[in-house]
Swiss-Prot record:
GO terms for molecular function: 2-methoxy-6-polyprenyl-1,4-benzoquinol methyltransferase activity; demethylmenaquinone methyltransferase activity. This is Ubiquinone/menaquinone biosynthesis C-methyltransferase UbiE. It catalyses: a 2-demethylmenaquinol + S-adenosyl-L-methionine = a menaquinol + S-adenosyl-L-homocysteine + H(+); a 2-methoxy-6-(all-trans-polyprenyl)benzene-1,4-diol + S-adenosyl-L-methionine = a 5-methoxy-2-methyl-3-(all-trans-polyprenyl)benzene-1,4-diol + S-adenosyl-L-homocysteine + H(+). InterPro entries: SAM-dependent_MTases_sf, UbiE/COQ5_MeTrFase, UbiE/COQ5_MeTrFase_CS. One of its GO terms (biological process) is menaquinone biosynthetic process. PROSITE patterns: SAM_MT_UBIE (PS51608), UBIE_1 (PS01183), UBIE_2 (PS01184). Its EC number is 2.1.1.163, 2.1.1.201. It comes from the Bacteria. The keyword Chaperone does not apply. It is an enzyme of class 2 (transferase).
């Protein structure tokens, strides 16, 4: 089995308990991070009528937050799609949001027309894409000119110190144990800290975005650098 296929199968296995584990393991902070990202995008992008796709949508958390943010910012979502390669995750998403279109597909080969989107989001999923540069090229293809890409991700820590040490201890020792109890799949939650360590620094990922044809509009780190938000415009 190829690396990408193994990652997808891992998410299939933990899909039934994924939402519960996320809320517990992040102490609910992941919802706040998502809301801040969506609201920031809505404030930067002036169009009122929006076509949105959430890539690596998982169980659909960002779909709901996009809808709430649009209502709050008095914008109209003409169309919103969730795309994910994990059938297990999509089964949960479809139960939660029966009126939303969900598509089983990978980020590196999106079944979307070129220049068809105003906004594309991917939350805590880009580090799981093996062919990352190909995915970024796809994001640029499906976005309209001046369309917005927003990425939320756990990035490699850049500084040491007490807080960084606490973060690392939690990720490597506590999170896998709790995640394993909730999901009965400890190895899936051991994958998380390993995937973060194997991902890019903030500067490295920004360079990849620029090379893919994006201009960085905003960057912000949350919770002492645990999570990072990248907002970019397609040139």
């Amino acid at each position: 089995m190829q690396k990408q296929e193994k990652i997808i199968e891992m998410f299939n296995q933990i899909a039934p308990t994924y939402d519960k584990a996320n809320r517990i393991l992040s102490f609910g902070a992941d919802v706040a991070w998502r809301k801040k990202a969506c609201q920031r995008v809505m404030s930067l992008y002036l169009k009122k009528d929006l076509k949105i796709a959430d890539i690596a949508c998982g169980t659909g958390d960002m779909i709901e937050i996009w809808q709430e943010s649009a209502l709050k910012m008095e914008k109209n979502i003409l169309n919103i799609k969730g795309i994910d390669p994990s059938s297990g995750m999509l089964n949960v998403a479809k139960e939660k949001f029966p009126n939303v279109e969900f598509i089983e597909a990978g980020a590196q080969n999106l079944p979307l027309e070129s220049q068809s989107l105003d906004i594309l989001s991917i939350s805590y999923g880009i580090r799981n894409v093996v062919e990352r540069q190909k995915a970024l090229s796809e994001f640029a293809r499906v976005l309209q000119k001046d369309g917005i890409l927003v990425v939320l991700e756990f990035t490699k820590r850049e500084k040491g110190g007490f807080i960084a040490a606490c973060r690392d201890f939690y990720l490597k020792n506590i999170l896998p144990s709790i995640g394993g109890i909730i999901s009965k799949n400890k190895s899936a939650y051991e994958y998380l800290p390993n995937s973060i360590e194997g991902f890019l620094s903030k500067e490295e990922f920004i360079l990849e975005l620029k090379n893919a044809g994006f201009e960085i509009l905003d960057y912000k780190s949350f919770s002492f650098g645990v999570s990072s938000m990248f907002i970019a415009k397609k040139l």
